[in-house]
Amino acid sequence: MTFWSILRQRCWGLVLVVAGVCVITFIISHLIPGDPARLLAGDRASDAIVENIRQQLGLDQPLYVQFYRYVSDLFQGDLGTSIRTGRPVLEELRIFFPATLELAFCALLLALLIGIPLGILSAVWRNRWLDHLVRIMAITGISTPAFWLGLGVVVLFYGHLQILPGGGRLDDWLDPPTHVTGFYLLDALLEGNGEVFFNALQHLILPALTLAFVHLGIVARQIRSAMLEQLSEDYIRIARASGLPGWYIVLCYALPNALIPSITVLGLALGDLLYGAVLTETVFAWPGMGAWVVTSIQELDFPAVMGFAVVVSFAYVLVNLVVDLLYLWIDPRIGRGGGE
């Protein structure tokens, strides 16, 4: 199997996944009890006003007509218009998506910076106290609800210790940096505004740590398993017999090979972080897509909910496509094996 044939296969998979998400999200969103026109008009509005709003939104048409119109607009890059705000969904996503992406990237960075060293040490000190601690962290991270964990760290670090802010991206008295990327940290650096940078960094610590905690243990366990496999290989025994220092063998021989199979897990982690940001943003009043889509669901804003699902699923599949191609580029044997 050539690189281009695998790329073509993965792209078809991307299209099928996004198409499936569109269909499922459309069906589920329209099965939710309630009338968006009634919510938009208010409880005191007459039936004639509600019916007029329903006609303006196209909600009086059959579902297959609404779906056809939605798909047609989607192919033109139009995600529809928010029922709640009256603005294009794509415009709202451009406002809220950078905040979610910044949070997800920082959480992934924390998970890697902490999880990889823990995984290495856990493999080197196998079945010792650190290895058991990492195992407990992994189980705790997977089993602890992000919502509960977020409330816990807010109560501890903001309520009792009062050493970190409990919500938002910036203090109320600070103006956001000039919008370039939508990432406050990066925009503040580009603007040369150190005060905004450090304030945004303080606000990012608690939500990023909360979001990273789940994947920190997973990354550590994945690195540990891959390291143990590499440390048992013959080339490691030869390196030890050659008199090379132990730390040099671990970092320069075992670790690079252990990172290769871990790439797939890291790609999945970034996709999971985008979805996991929904609850985390709600707890920390983080003005990203999570809080926005929760409000949209509560107010039966179908176009906004479907736009969120399409964008996040596309980002998730795209990240995994890049990871698969990177994995193939690093280890071409996968492509040759697939061809056989």
Region locations from a protein language model:
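N-terminal signal-anchor/first transmembrane alpha helix
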Residues: 1-60, 90, 94, 121, ...
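Alpha-helical transmembrane segments of integral membrane proteins
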Residues: 2-6, 97-130, 176-340
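An internal, D/E-rich "acidic patch" concept
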Residues: 3, 60-116
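Residue-level recognition of pore/gate-forming positions within transmembrane alpha-helices
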Residues: 14, 22, 44, 111-112, ...
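Hydrophobic alpha-helical transmembrane segments of membrane transport/permease proteins
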Residues: 17-68, 157-196
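Hydrophobic alpha-helical transmembrane segments
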Residues: 42-58, 149-159, 206-211, 248-265
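Hydrophobic alpha-helical segments embedded in or immediately adjacent to the lipid bilayer
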Residues: 117-121, 130-180
